[in-house]
Amino acid sequence: MYYIGLDVHKKTISYCVKDASGQVHREGTIGANRNELDWWMKTLPQPWTVAMEATIFTGWIYDHLLPHMRPR
């Protein structure tokens, strides 16, 4: 399982991908839009789950990512 932390801003999303041992596999920034999220999700190691702080900018991201996440 891979664990992804998101730091969501109005125009960008910073991310960090770690494995179960805590080793960082990837860090970066993508644009905060559906097209970039779709591209980014295709590049992620499987399976994965995500965590992010709930802010005014995160509602649509949660809704967009939810169908792609593996249930616990």
Predicted regions, residues:
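Phosphate- and other anionic-substrate recognition elements at nucleic-acid/protein interfaces
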Residues: M1-R72
